[in-house]
Amino acid sequence: MNISALKARIRASKEDLYPLPLEQIVVAEGALREAAAFIAKQAESGVVLVADSHTYKAAGRDLHDHLCQKGVKADWHLLEPNSNGDIIADEVSLISVMLKVEQSTKLLVAVGAGTIHDIVRFVSGKTNKPFVSIPTAPSVDGFTSLGAPIVVQGSKKTYQLVAPIALFADTVVLQHAPPALIAAGFGDMVGKYTSLFDWKIGSLLKNEAYSDLVADLTEEALSTCVDKVADIGKRTSAGVQVLMESLLTSGLAMALFGYSHPASGAEHHLSHYWEMEALRLGKKQLLHGAKVGLSTQIINRFYKNTVLPDVHRFLDDDEAKQVIALVEALPDPDDVKALLEQAGWNEALVPIAPELVEESLQHAYLLRDRYTLLRLYREGTTMKKEGDAHVGRS
């Protein structure tokens, strides 16, 4: 990725954004060697590498060999799955990593996908120890962001903490990632259709903070990703590189803005609701991006088929006109599904009960203090009903 070009765009925009957090981003074959060279410059000892048994085999072992060749002394911490076989970013995982961090620790290294990065990001932010990102799958857009979604006492909360100081993604490693993780990464990108929509709605109707540059960066990443969906589905080197760079751009956009609005709207709220229900019931977790792929279709269809015909009930004429134009510009939900399927996504990856879908459409907007069209619709129609009831009683 061309960080210099991105910095130039940021300067030219003259927008009041957060500084670009990463010193270096490499997405290429042989990136693990470059990662070892970077880490060696940061610290010759006091390096803690965090992975699980799968990501250690995927990239950790080779990275460790490269570090040894550079004379770097590094300790490993392998995260343990729960009874369902899932690595969860919860109190147990956080404490296990915290116990590996000592006063002499200079650098943390996250070797894995989204959850491992969430755990390391949280520990990095709380201990003031920088971390380096080594993604093993192009599965989520959170690698370069500031946010760490953490499960605390069964509920998920996102903590705004720190981005990695550098990221190295080896395309050979990415190509060998499980196909479901690659499909999930594409699902996370497809979610930008509705997240960008909801962010625009919040800005227009509720005066929420907005950035044209951040929106443009996110939209460009989405378009580039969609254009290469065939290559992504075939897991070509070019395909996984485009997907990884699109996900990273989305994460950087969030970091520049300081919040997740560009990449997380009602579609993510539905996904989080489903995840919390699975945690409550002790069920195995589903892939985040796979859920977002489904929730994007659901929320898109809900906006077009349910909200749009009812929009004048809770918005004035000028607001309704703006919302109608934006909803009509959203892609057809069936077209979104076709794109996802090209990337390897299928509904079997997300066996969500229809009852849970309906429940999430009713209540998921309450999970975040953020305006989305789903929130405006639920709150607006509720107020309308209450007002009508009051008139009826008077």
From Swiss-Prot:
Catalyzes the NAD(P)H-dependent reduction of dihydroxyacetonephosphate (DHAP or glycerone phosphate) to glycerol 1-phosphate (G1P). The G1P thus generated is probably used for the synthesis of phosphoglycerolipids in Gram-positive bacterial species. This is Glycerol-1-phosphate dehydrogenase [NAD(P)+]. Binds 1 nickel ion per subunit. GO terms for biological process: glycerophospholipid metabolic process; phospholipid biosynthetic process. NAD(+) binds at residues 52, 114-118, 136-139, 145. Substrate binds at residues 141, 188, 272. It comes from Shouchella clausii (strain KSM-K16). The lineage of its organism: Bacteria, Bacillati, Bacillota, Bacilli, Bacillales. Homodimer. The gene is egsA. One of its GO terms (cellular component) is cytoplasm. PANTHER family: GLYCEROL DEHYDROGENASE, GLYCEROL DEHYDROGENASE 1. GO terms for molecular function: glycerol-1-phosphate dehydrogenase (NAD+) activity; glycerol-1-phosphate dehydrogenase (NADP+) activity; metal ion binding. It is an enzyme of class 1 (oxidoreductase). Its cofactor is Ni(2+).
